[in-house]
Amino acid sequence: MMSSVKKTICVLLVCFTMMSVMLLGPGVTEVSAASDAKVNISADRQVIRGFGGMNHPAWIGDLTAAQRETAFGNGQNQLGFSVLRIHVDENRNNWYKEVETAKSAIKHGAIVFASPWNPPNDMVETFNHNGDTSAKRLRYDKYAAYAQHLNDFVNFMKSNGVNLYAISMQNEPDYAHEWTWWTPQEILRFMRENAGSINARVIAPESFQYLKNISDPILNDPQALRNMDILGTHLYGTQVSQFPYPLFKQKGGGKELWMTEVYYPNSDNNSADRWPEALGVSEHIHHSMVEGDFQAYVWWYIRRSYGPMKEDGMISKRGYNMAHFSKFVRPGYVRIDATKNPEPNVYVSAYKGDNKVVIVAINKNNTGVNQNFVLQNGTASQVSRWITSSSSNLQPGTDLKVTDNHFWAHLPAQSVTTFVVKR
């Protein structure tokens, strides 16, 4: 659910991002990059779980059968999403609404996780939250019952053919004007005393803005940390400088790190095809992978006028930007080191899996860039590529040959290119 405050946060953030595009101005038609983009095939970083989005039939209606194929299939004119997020309704009579799309995602090899907005009504009480006397929180004597409620959802989905990969304890506990608030200490108590009884991987705490004061207490408490499997967060208005999380690197060994909800750069009506604004989506994913070390990137509504799939079921420009990652960087692939910024406004990330190297290169400049890619600690022979620009959507380019472990490629102005290198 969107609010004007959250939308304002995102608009302010994107103003800074888009200024770089606006200020580049006209110039020569192409340049050669100042530096090589070096890809070190043996320098492993994080394992990638996947890319995807949210289905919320209770609020905006279910995906149709055809839209499920577009979302989770990986053929032509399909997004290749490998992660689905679903809603844990406070009313169990509505749980059936989540089944069909989740089963379709599973059939296509995607993983499914679930997030609750509210506990059942009989577990909730109102309190005064900064003057709001109708604010909601989980009653302190209902923590165990709430854990069982989450278990019941896990079991319901399993009995209907969906084995959840994970379940969250709460969506945005720190931005709960329209759902249930949790303080950091309340989250800590639940994670320490109750989360261990949940029969699925547990995601916490899903802060709306990656506010570390929400998750630090979990990382600093051995029992709570033991009960958390995935640290999940949202990135609404989060500056890239806040993407790294040193405490997680220090104490989160064996845990996963997911970005579980965002829309970017805004949620304006009918904005999904704006160009070059949509190029910001691939840049945002790049920073999430490279600066944030996230293992999953999950959009808000899959089908929306500002989302990866428009209301008519067609893939949007924003969706094609996501597809440059989701279709090629498959679950279990590993991000590897690459020169992340070989030229101003050029961003490069690289991944390996299935005996391939996948390189995603984003050129935000108003001019084309000729970029040299150097493959280190591995051999390759041929490169396929796909390009999205103002005039193309995942358009296949001519294959390139690798000579002495490097290849040159033209990155069109304001474009994203995915290279698949055969090893």
Swiss-Prot record:
Under Enzyme Commission nomenclature, its number is 3.2.1.136
Task: Identify the metabolic or biological route this protein is part of.
Answer: Glycan degradation; xylan degradation
> Keyword Transferase on this protein?
no
InterPro entries xref list: Glyco_hydro_30, Glyco_hydro_b, Glycoside_hydrolase_SF
Q: What's a BP term from Gene Ontology annotated to this protein?
A: sphingolipid metabolic process
Give the range the annotation lists for the signal sequence: 1-33
**GO MF, any single term:** glucuronoarabinoxylan endo-1,4-beta-xylanase activity
Report the locations given in the UniProt record. Secreted
Q: Function of this protein?
A: Catalyzes the depolymerization of methylglucuronoxylan (MeGAXn). It cleaves the beta-1,4-xylosidic bond penultimate to that linking carbon one of the xylose residue substituted with alpha-1,2-linked 4-O-methyl-D-glucuronate (MeGA).
Q: Which family does it belong to?
A: Belongs to the glycosyl hydrolase 30 family.
Q: What name appears for this protein in its UniProt entry?
A: Glucuronoxylanase XynC
